[in-house]
């Protein structure tokens, strides 16, 4: 039988790690800080990729691929950018190994030292803007809307599967525009695409906002963010979109002739989402029984489990199960038939519950005789007997209902764990006893932001775009505040 999971209440961190391993999403790799994404976990990422890629292309973006290696001199061109990533950069210094004299080992060949060291891509602004210099001459070349699907390396010291690893997968968009207004509009458009993706596919209510100057992306004029609240009350930054101004254009001399015939620098944006979203799915929706997946990104939306005692029953039920599976697939429903004999139905029920499959279908002798099936929802464990001639309509409706329920549940959790405070004492009590999102006034200074973090471990998650902007006084200094910001303890 399946070993029982630790509960969320007992140890949230262990519960999270065990779900990822036992549901076969990922595992720690031989290289410290790296992970191996297993086929089931990668299938979720592929679903996310397909949905996002379609949305990007619908808004005029094209995919390209740029080198993983970046000359160190490129990073020096944008001082704020390099400062933000310097401590996380992996550096290539040599290009060849050689065998030792006894032939027992390989060592770095000292004669193969690179003239210029190469940085393993932590993000691609510098290498991409170097290309844009050659691609853009006139306003007719704008806007330039490019996306890249790739891996990046950031040498994290404290790692956690999906949430923070030395290497991870992501998409990074990089665009160039003729005007400031167009670039700002692009950054907000991509933020909204991310937020809609969260609601419509991940069933996660993302809070949209602006990062403070202290939390802003290195080299950006403005960073927009989507923040999610996990079941342990911690915040998770799920994606960001940056208005870069003309910083990278000036650093890499990316100019264009505008419609007035004058030479000007282009305006830029960059934006990205990562495999961290799989971690967000786990922590937002899953329960003490295992993974719970939103249907629209689930690799298997429905699993069919035949139940039989005799060979005669097996053949008839398998035939019916195969027929239903083919019907479901024909209607774009991802259906798996588990006809393995080495495991009993009860074992299979537990297996697919652990793996978060949205719907389980059981077909036994009585179902065959009555032309029915039994459907069980993963989110509520509710069982329903359904006539087979109505199966497509019912399954489609149930998948939508599961998505809506997961979203509503996550939204209500966020609302119930969002607190408004008016004093620093209230703030400290809320952050230590309740966690969640804390709405509080802040005076707008980095110093106050740092002091609050030092004393409570809480950071400003964002200046919200969708919350009442009434002025007040800072909870820490008593100085004037333009609006409440969202604090939280974060991953």
Swiss-Prot record:
Q: Which GO terms describe its molecular function?
A: ATP binding; proline-tRNA ligase activity
Entry-linked Pfam families: HGTP_anticodon, ProRS-C_1, tRNA-synt_2b
Localization, UniProt: Cytoplasm
What are the record keywords, sorted? Aminoacyl-tRNA synthetase, ATP-binding, Cytoplasm, Ligase, Nucleotide-binding, Protein biosynthesis
Q: What is its EC number?
A: 6.1.1.15
Q: Show the catalytic activity.
A: tRNA(Pro) + L-proline + ATP = L-prolyl-tRNA(Pro) + AMP + diphosphate
Tell me a GO cellular component.
Answer: cytoplasm
Q: Which InterPro entries match?
A: aa-tRNA-synt_IIb (IPR002314), aa-tRNA-synth_II (IPR006195), aa-tRNA-synth_II/BPL/LPL (IPR045864), Anticodon-bd (IPR004154), Anticodon-bd_dom_sf (IPR036621), Pro-tRNA-ligase_IIa_arc-type (IPR004499), Pro-tRNA_ligase_II_C (IPR016061), Pro-tRNA_synth_II (IPR017449)
**Gene3D superfamilies linked to this entry:** Anticodon-binding domain, Bira Bifunctional Protein, Domain 2, C-terminal domain of ProRS
Where's it mainly located?
A: cytoplasm
Looking at the keywords, is ATP-binding present? Answer: yes
- Would the keyword ATP-binding turn up in this protein's UniProt record? yes
User: What are the GO BP annotations of this UniProt entry?
Assistant: prolyl-tRNA aminoacylation
Domain comment?
Consists of three domains: the N-terminal catalytic domain, the anticodon-binding domain and the C-terminal extension.
Q: What does this protein do?
A: Catalyzes the attachment of proline to tRNA(Pro) in a two-step reaction: proline is first activated by ATP to form Pro-AMP and then transferred to the acceptor end of tRNA(Pro).
Q: Which family does it belong to?
A: Belongs to the class-II aminoacyl-tRNA synthetase family. ProS type 3 subfamily.
Assembly description: Homodimer.
Its protein name is Proline--tRNA ligase
The organism's lineage is: Bacteria, Pseudomonadati, Bacteroidota, Cytophagia, Cytophagales
